[in-house]
Swiss-Prot record:
Pfam families: RdRP_4, Rotavirus_VP1. Transmembrane segments: none annotated. Disulfide bonds: none annotated. Coiled coil: none annotated. GO terms for cellular component: virion component. Belongs to the reoviridae RNA-directed RNA polymerase family. It catalyses: RNA(n) + a ribonucleoside 5'-triphosphate = RNA(n+1) + diphosphate. This is RNA-directed RNA polymerase. Its cofactor is Mg(2+). Its EC number is 2.7.7.48. It comes from Rotavirus A (strain RVA/SA11-Patton/G3P[X]) (RV-A). One of its GO terms (biological process) is DNA-templated transcription. The keyword Transferase applies.
């Protein structure tokens, strides 16, 4: 068994090191004789420990268990009251504690003052500005670091250097914390006033960030960066990350391209050996030096020096150090401001009348025309989605907050809740549901606010609008997104593309006569000037569209949408400031509407077009591409002559001057070789991503459990690692141990083993080998998976009570009746289940389910239930396949250049051998004919699981299913009677399997699964025509080959001789695969 169990056992002896501590390992086996020995062994261990006897004899007597059974969990047992952290910490607190400089930050509360100075009384205190928002504590983090340090104090050679670097940094952290004492957390992992009052306010979040940074130190460079960030972030809680990452926007413009990848006509990446010189005017260097100066003024020394040194030869080879600095800067933690300051930030902008009206008009018209272009077709054809927009909105209503808490009655149960879905049900039950009236958000009913915190940027506010806004906008926005999906300009939405495609798009046209203009418009989006022209453009577009139809329902939809825009032009927000709630007129665009992303992209595109049309008066160029991606836009301009410093200087100044005429405070840059936007940056013809996901601090608290957060932590670690920021894996595993342990009583704790946490069951948290998703096929693995599946999903009394109430039932019935033309149990049950699942975001319900889950888990970890679940998982399928494959050694040459320098070596190697993919594999069934047929006539969107169920029904049942959703009988008949139907069966099965195998997550999303180089390693003689079977055999083989290569850095080839008789059996099995949701799949999904 793996490294995890070994570390677990060492960790337990490190934590519970007193005489009274006992560790009892619990084993299980699928072999019934051995299983009985496991049970005996366990009960004797308990017996002995109760009587204070040693367990050593038992370990000898039951050697067969230890050798042959599988470790299930470790029960640990200690009467020691847990003040061990303080004791251990003293050993490391040998340095000088940090002293915060209390004048660094502009806002008083952002200075790291004593808590009692910022909040004189407990009533005034709030932890919202420093809450780590993660279900693990500072003391656990300290323990994890000290465990690592103790374990490695005897390392030698290079490893000793790493130890010394980390020890040195930890001394700073330990000394500072030791000066004030370790803050103790409460049961909810929050830090209360009496704990914090005599300590610096930001101590906890700073210490978490510092630990995260020091455990990511390997090289000397890492050490210098980390040391500087740890020391300075103790005082500077506001601008440090921004200062350190600012230079990147210029650095990308300084590296020559010598060979790069470009997108070809087939949308694949293709190597191009072009050479493009970086042309940099002096003004750019002045700006860069100014940035470096600002860094030095803030007390940074080593980081600006590294950048300065790199500037000497500006080589792409040494650029990864710049990328590293850029990534590290985010790990100083989130900047959390008071809501008032976050809102006032946008309102501080000086409003001038001195703007170019002509440009504003052009901007508004472009928005208008784009809105019309997006919605023209659906409006002219009276699209059913626009007719049934209200139903569509209700079906996809979220369970987020509706902005106010209300008392709701469900049957005999009365609850208080803020959730949108519950408010809708309650309003319907009480005749208050009026989707045709969009409530005002003016001074009488100001908008409550949410917040979005990001490292290195100011806190942004989010509107929490009444659900009527969502219903009014949903259908129209969906139509806009469908348009954006096949429009290349919208990089974020473009059909199944990924970031690599966008990378090839930029490099495609770069040459000695082109320049690329890139702008960060996040400031513009939330500026006051944007609001009138922005909303007016949309309104004008809607007015034009209204003249294109006579359908009353479509007109109503457009009208309600228009009303949301009108209302939002006069918006007020409510901000709690101490005990008072301030109402402020807010004239800017904030997130929170359904249209936020789509509308921002439209406005962005309009903005860059407006600017380009202005500067084309002065310069003659052809616009090769325009792209908008979130808050950023970029364009490649081609000139008739070679680009010179002077030209760049002129274009750059003209662009800035043009933006200034609209009073748009944006960062606009021009370069010949690279760009930097929020999502990715291109330098020297290579693509980089910012590895800036915080591990030990979270943005906000949600209702995820400790297990969920452990999986999210692991998932974040993986994403960072792929992007070039590596945290020590042993440390991550130690955090997983801490976060997945279950307390039974004060002195009893249960720690699950690696097998439990890595088998793909409903409890999976991480992979035993980074980047490789294993599907266990050994008897013990399948046995434990079956056992976990027998733990049916947990019920909740509150949820059942709500679901039984007439309020809930009537709501679900109402949805079904509006949607269905005849009885359809699959859909009705689906709606009821979805609605019931939405209740999970109501805390009491999720708590109830969590408790039930934990008690079931506790039983399970002490003795697995023998239960033969009849469900088939993907593991069963792979287990059937495995025996028929024979392995032999193979060789694949490296044939592609590197284009993503931050990748770990083993992943890089695979891309260099088989190539990368620029598209997402379709894994939701949306491309199938049946899915398209349904969306042609109905607003209902079946999930991949539902399609998978439906497509395997009898033909007449499929017909009934379709007819009930309003598909005309003739179309349903044609579908079932045609070849398309059998093609669909295969296609949906394919999507479903891809979905189960997480093919679009982790590092698998980077590999070209259809690579001819990969195909030639796999030989499967063609027997009988069952494409589904051929597909699964090939896919299994590809995963095996790739996983082997990730692990060993070499290739194997597979030969499969699959008997014809088995094929039909396998094919039947493939229609009964159960999908498993786990914290692990959740975390993947959570990544995007």
């Amino acid at each position: 068994m793996g490294k995890y169990n070994l570390i677990l056992s060492e960790y337990l002896s490190f934590i519970y090191n007193s005489q009274s501590a006992v560790q009892i390992p619990i084993y299980y086996s699928s072999n019934s004789e051995l299983e009985n020995r496991c049970i005996e062994f366990h009960s004797k261990c308990l017996e002995n420990s109760k009587n204070g006897l040693s367990l050593r004899k038992l370990f000898v007597e039951y050697n067969d268990v230890i050798e042959n059974a599988t470790l299930l969990s470790i029960l640990s047992y200690s009467y020691d009251k847990y003040n061990a952290v303080e004791r251990k910490l003293v050993k490391y607190a040998k340095g000088k504690p940090l002293e915060a400089d209390l004048t660094v930050n502009e806002l008083d509360y952002e200075n790291n003052k004593m808590t009692s100075e910022l909040f004189p009384t407990a009533e005034e205190y709030t932890d919202s500005l420093m809450d780590p928002a993660i279900l693990t504590s500072l003391s656990s983090n300290l323990n994890a670091v000290m465990f690592w340090l103790e374990k490695h104090e005897n390392d030698v050679a290079e490893k000793l250097k790493v130890y010394k670097r980390r020890l040195d940094l930890f001394t700073i952290v330990a000394s500072t914390i030791n000066k004030y004492g370790v803050p103790r957390h409460n049961a909810k992992y929050r830090y209360e006033y009496d704990v914090m009052k005599d300590k610096p306010y930001y101590l906890v979040t700073w210490a978490n960030s510092s630990i995260e940074m020091l455990m990511s130190v390997f090289s000397h460079d890492d050490y210098l960066i980390a040391k500087e960030l740890i020391v300075l972030s103790y005082s500077n809680r506001s601008t440090l990350a921004k200062l350190v990452s600012s230079p990147m926007s210029i650095l990308v413009a300084l590296v020559d391209i010598n060979g790069t990848f470009i997108t070809n006509e087939e949308l694949e990446l293709e190597f191009s050996n072009k050479y493009v010189r970086a042309i940099v005017p002096d003004q750019t260097f002045d700006e860069l030096n100014q940035m470096l100066d600002n860094m030095r003024k803030a007390g940074l020394v080593d980081i600006p020096k590294m950048i300065q040194d790199w500037l000497v030869d500006r080589s792409i080879e040494k650029f990864p150090l710049m990328a590293k600095i850029y990534s590290w800067s985010f790990h100083v933690g989130f900047r959390k401001q008071k809501m008032l300051d976050a809102a006032l930030d946008q309102l501080k902008t000086e409003y001038t009348e001195n703007v170019d009206d002509e440009m504003y008009r052009e901007y508004t018209m472009l928005i208008r025309d784009e809105v019309v272009k997006m919605l023209e077709e659906p409006v002219k054809h009276d699209d059913h989605l626009l007719r049934d927009s209200e139903l569509a909105g209700l079906l996809s209503m979220s369970s987020a907050s509706n902005g106010e808490s209300r008392q709701l009655k469900f049957g005999r149960k009365t609850i208080f809740s803020t959730k949108k879905n519950m408010h809708v049900m309650d309003d319907m039950a009480n005749e208050r549901y009026t989707p045709g009236i969009i409530p005002p958000v003016n001074v009488d009913k100001p908008i409550p606010l949410g917040r979005r915190d990001v490292p290195g940027r100011r806190t942004r506010i989010i509107f929490i609008l009444p659900y009527e806004y969502f219903i009014a906008q949903h259908a129209v926005v969906e139509k806009m997104l469908i348009y954006a999906k096949h429009t290349r300009e919208y990089a974020e939405f473009y059909s199944q593309s990924n970031q690599l495609l966008s990378y090839g798009d930029v490099t495609r046209f770069l040459s000695n006569n082109t320049m690329v203009l890139y702008t960060d418009v996040s400031q513009w989006d939330s500026s006051q000037h944007n609001t009138q022209p922005f909303r007016k453009g949309i309104i004008m577009g809607l007015d034009i569209l209204a003249n294109m139809t006579n359908d009353a329902k479509v007109l109503q939809t457009l009208n309600l949408y228009k009303q949301t825009q009108i209302n939002l032009m006069d918006s007020y927000v409510q901000i709690p400031d101490g005990n008072v709630i301030k109402k402020i007129q807010y004239g800017a665009v904030a997130s929170g509407e359904k249209q936020t992303k789509a509308a921002n992209s439209i406005a962005n595109l309009a903005l860059i077009k407006t600017v380009l049309s202005r500067i084309s008066n002065k310069h003659s160029f052809a616009t090769k591409i325009i792209r908008v991606d979130g808050d950023d836009n970029y364009a490649v301009l081609q000139f008739n002559t070679e680009v010179t410093k002077q030209m760049i200087q002129d274009v750059s100044n003209d662009v800035r001057e043009t933006y200034a005429r609209m009073n748009a405070k944006v960062k606009a840059l021009v370069s010949t070789v690279g760009i930097e936007i929020a999502k990715r940056y291109i330098a020297g013809g290579k693509i980089f991503f910012r590895a800036g996901i915080n591990l030990l601090n979270n943005e906000k608290r949600g209702q995820s459990t400790q297990w969920d957060q452990a999986a999210i932590l692991y998932s974040n670690y993986i994403v960072n690692r792929l992007r070039g920021f590596e945290t020590d894996r042993e440390f991550i595993l130690t955090k997983i141990m801490q976060m997945t342990s279950v307390a039974i009583t004060g002195s009893l704790r249960l720690f699950p083993s690696e097998r439990v946490l890595t088998t793909n069951s409903t409890f999976k948290v991480f992979d035993s080998e980074d980047f490789i998703i294993e599907y266990g096929t050994t008897v013990d693995e399948v046995y434990i998976q079956r056992a976990f599946m027998s733990l049916s999903s947990q019920k909740s009394g509150i949820a059942d009570e709500i679901a039984a109430s007439s309020t809930f039932k009537n709501y679900v019935t109402r949805l079904s009746e509006q949607l269905l033309f005849s009885k359809n149990n699959i859909v009705s049950r689906g709606i009821a289940l979805t609605e019931k699942a939405k209740l999970n975001s109501y805390a009491p319900i999720s708590l109830e389910k969590r408790r039930a889950q934990i008690s079931a888990l506790l039983t399970m970890l002490q003795k697995p239930v023998t239960f033969k679940s009849s469900k088939i998982t993907i593991n069963d399928i792979l287990r059937d396949i495995k025996p028929f494959f024979t392995v032999s050694d193979a060789h694949l040459p490296i044939q592609y250049q590197k284009f993503m320098p931050t990748l770990p070596d083993n992943v890089q190697y695979i891309i260099q051998c088989i190539g990368s993919r620029t598209y997402q594999i379709e894994d939701d069934g949306s491309k199938s004919a049946i899915s398209r047929l349904i969306s042609k006539y109905s607003v209902y969107k079946p999930s991949i699981e539902e399609l998978y169920k439906v497509i395997s029904l009898h033909e007449n049942e499929i017909q009934l299913y379709l007819i009930s959703l309003g598909i005309p009988k003739i179309d349903a008949d044609t579908y079932v009677g045609s070849k398309i139907y059998s093609r669909d069966k295969y296609r949906i099965l394919e999507s479903y399997v891809y979905n189960l195998l997480s093919i679009n997550y982790g590092c698998y999303q980077l590999f070209d699964f259809n690579s001819p180089d990969l195909e030639k390693l796999i030989r499967i003689p063609f027997k009988g025509k069952i494409p589904a079977v051929t597909f699964i055999l090939h896919l299994y083989a590809k995963l095996e080959v790739i996983n082997y290569a990730i692990k060993n850095g070499s290739w194997i080839s597979l030969f499969c001789n699959y008997p014809k008789s088995e094929m039909i059996k396998l094919w039947k099995k493939m229609w009964n695969i159960t999908s498993l949701r786990s914290p692990y799949t959740n975390a993947n999904f959570f990544q995007e």
